């Protein structure tokens, strides 16, 4: 009986950290890899790569914990989130706080193996991860904060590799914010009706009938910024072809969200994993002289 209870608790922690749903970690991973490959340029040192990959999964898990902690009073009123570990009682508030601290401490121990500039930047990463979940109560632009949180690994990666944050770094950071606002608006379109009822704010609500148009403009901005980064760094044809493919994926997403159906909007959100992957493969091909 005791093992059963322990096993159930571990499964609840597993669900709370979303380790059963890797899409969020992947959307955080791809920009991190973009930055590491451009900053190096090429393949980064194995230890730095390992620290950032592990950090992505740990901090994404920590972000999910604090997000559910912040939303614990709201999630029970939304059909999609009512069975999450905190509102369902599978995990207590005290356990959630302890889990968050453990995940952050492990992440920070990894960062301590890097240079001073990266360590200092990691403090801002923690602040963004903590602040984001509460923004949806006060502003219709929480997706912008999410983009900054998901993209802060970009200046950290540049700092870890070169102890500098050049123009390419900040252009990539901006591109990631635009991308995050676009894909998280698609995600927010799934819950828009529920969010309006319980007072949660989002760009999906703010954009209203112009949501598809604004998402399209943001996606064009992402492609333009990534093309500029390619020009600044002398990247090859493989990279530019990846931008073309990413553009085709964005067009497909526009088709999916055309009627604003929940399942289709969620499918469009999930499709962004391929956008990140394609752009990374383009970078890799360019540096490997394909």
UniProtKB/Swiss-Prot annotation:
InterPro entries per the UniProt record, alphabetical: HB_polyprenyltransferase-like, Prenyltransferase, UbiA_prenyltransferase, UbiA_prenylTrfase_CS, UbiA_sf
Cross-referenced Pfam families: UbiA
Principal EC category: transferase
Catalytic activity: all-trans-octaprenyl diphosphate + 4-hydroxybenzoate = 4-hydroxy-3-(all-trans-octaprenyl)benzoate + diphosphate
Molecular function terms, GO-annotated: 4-hydroxybenzoate polyprenyltransferase activity
EC code(s) of this entry: 2.5.1.39
Membrane topology: Multi-pass membrane protein
Co-factor requirement: Mg(2+)
GO terms (BP aspect): ubiquinone biosynthetic process
Family as reported in the entry's similarity comment: Belongs to the UbiA prenyltransferase family.
Protein name: 4-hydroxybenzoate octaprenyltransferase
Species the sequence originates in: Escherichia coli (strain 55989 / EAEC)
């Amino acid at each position: 009986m005791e093992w059963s209870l322990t096993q159930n608790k571990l499964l609840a922690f597993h669900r709370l950290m979303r380790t059963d749903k890797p899409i969020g970690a992947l959307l955080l991973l791809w920009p991190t890899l973009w930055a590491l490959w451009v900053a190096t340029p090429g393949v980064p040192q194995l230890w730095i790569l390992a620290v950032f990959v592990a950090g992505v999964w740990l901090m994404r898990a920590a972000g999910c914990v604090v997000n559910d902690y912040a939303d614990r009073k709201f999630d029970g009123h939304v059909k999609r989130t009512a069975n999450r570990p905190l509102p369902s009682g599978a995990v207590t508030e005290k356990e959630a706080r302890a889990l968050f601290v453990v995940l952050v401490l492990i992440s920070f121990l990894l960062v301590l193996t890097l240079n001073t500039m990266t360590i200092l930047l990691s403090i801002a990463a923690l602040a963004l991860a903590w602040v984001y979940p509460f923004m949806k109560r006060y502003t219709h632009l929480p997706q912008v904060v999410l983009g900054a949180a998901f993209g802060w690994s970009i200046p950290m990666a540049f700092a870890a590799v070169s102890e500098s944050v050049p123009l390419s770094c900040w252009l990539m950071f901006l591109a990631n914010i635009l991308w995050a606002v676009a894909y998280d608006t698609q995600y927010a379109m799934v819950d828009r009706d529920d969010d309006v009822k319980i007072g949660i704010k989002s760009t999906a609500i703010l954009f209203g009938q112009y949501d598809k148009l604004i998402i399209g403009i943001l996606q064009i901005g992402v492609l333009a910024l990534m093309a500029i980064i390619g020009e600044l760094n002398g990247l090859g044809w493989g990279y530019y072809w990846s931008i073309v493919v990413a553009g085709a994926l964005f067009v497909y997403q526009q088709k999916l969200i055309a009627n604003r159906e929940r399942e289709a909007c969620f499918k469009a959100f999930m499709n962004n994993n391929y956008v990140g992957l394609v752009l990374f493969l383009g970078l890799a091909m360019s540096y490997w002289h394909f």
